[in-house]
């Protein structure tokens, strides 16, 4: 079989790694801010600052990790050693994040959050950057790579869906008492344990079951194989001075602001703005399932019919409009009663369109 023609097994093995990455990102974006702010009592400004610092470290580490991986030489190639190593610091970071020492002052808790979130972002970068590069190297065929990234996108969202269902249907309703479940510190213990097991299994499975593709992967030339600090900075400078990449970077910056704000405030919106129960918040995952499915099915076809820039611009507009549509309708007085199942249905319908746009955009 031609190296360009990939088996379903390879596509599935590559994709399952994104499940671990998706679960990690869901933990970071969906729970961390709320846990430290509403459960542990850290002020919103300090919580936000800690998360910002971690994201800045993440932004710097991504190109450095890419440059190191591009130049790395080993019997396992230049991607797989990092993919195999990533689960261990990731698990440690999640444990530290959800089990801070007792008796910390507010600034002590602030420092602990900074340390644990930086470690988490750096750890998942250790997997995500080589894994993404691996996807681009699995085949030289453009449409085959689009299919590979469709699997990656689908499995990434599966990580989100699995964590969402586990947390909102099984954990938070179980711990509900005088307060809603998400406000009890004890409810986050099983979440941390489950996420650590899921992330480790998915990342290690992806690394193990794609290692048979190593002989087909590109290797660095002898001149590129030496890792030097100066080369790392040259790579970063070369990237940011590339006009097309700079435009893409600016676009990704604003898109990341949109996505990060939406994901971080999602638990606040469901709990305090919409006044939904944990079960009702759990059912909101339907919009993601519908949207991800349509994105998985349609993306390759859209790429065959339209240029990528057209697809990207259209889906960004759709994502922006429909993600905020429910809240805008509520503020204008056109939404169903808060806490009602009619409201849940409206959020699901509008959110499905937004999720489809986001899924297509992510793959593109």
Enumerate the predicted regions with their spans.
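Membrane-embedded alpha-helical bundles of multi-pass transporters/translocases
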Residues: 1-364
């Amino acid at each position: 079989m031609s190296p360009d023609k990939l088996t379903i097994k390879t596509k599935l093995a590559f994709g399952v790694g994104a499940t671990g990455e998706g679960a990690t990102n869901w933990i970071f974006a969906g729970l961390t801010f709320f846990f430290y702010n509403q459960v542990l009592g850290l002020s919103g400004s300090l919580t936000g600052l800690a998360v910002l610092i971690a994201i800045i470290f993440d932004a710097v580490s991504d190109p450095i990790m890419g440059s190191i991986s591009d130049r790395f030489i080993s019997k396992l190639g230049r991607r797989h050693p990092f993919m195999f190593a990533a689960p261990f610091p990731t698990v440690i970071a999640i444990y530290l994040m959800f089990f801070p020492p007792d008796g910390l002052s507010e600034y002590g808790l602030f420092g602990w959050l900074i340390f644990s979130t930086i470690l988490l972002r750096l750890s998942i970068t250790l997997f995500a950057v080589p894994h993404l590069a691996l996807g681009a190297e699995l085949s030289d065929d453009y449409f085959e790579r689009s299919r590979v990234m469709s699997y990656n996108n689908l499995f990434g969202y599966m990580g989100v869906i699995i964590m969402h269902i586990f947390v909102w249907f099984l954990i938070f309703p179980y711990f509900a008492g005088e307060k809603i479940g998400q406000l009890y510190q004890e409810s986050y213990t099983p979440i941390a344990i489950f996420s650590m097991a899921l992330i480790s299994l998915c990342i290690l499975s992806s690394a193990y079951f794609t290692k048979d593709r190593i002989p087909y992967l590109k290797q660095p030339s002898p001149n590129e194989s030496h890792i030097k600090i100066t080369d790392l900075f040259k790579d970063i400078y070369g990237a940011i001075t590339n006009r097309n990449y700079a435009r893409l970077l600016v676009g990704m910056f604003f898109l990341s602001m949109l996505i990060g704000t939406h994901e971080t405030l999602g638990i606040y919106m469901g709990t305090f703005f919409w006044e939904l129960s944990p079960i009702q918040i759990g059912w909101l995952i339907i919009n993601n399932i519908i949207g991800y499915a349509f994105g998985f099915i349609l993306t390759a076809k859209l790429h065959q019919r339209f240029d990528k820039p057209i697809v990207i611009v259209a889906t960004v507009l759709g994502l922006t409009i429909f993600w905020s549509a429910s809240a805008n309708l509520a503020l204008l007085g056109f939404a169903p009663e808060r806490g009602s199942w009619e409201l849940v249905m409206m959020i699901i319908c509008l959110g499905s369109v937004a999720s489809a746009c986001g899924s297509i955009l992510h793959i593109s």
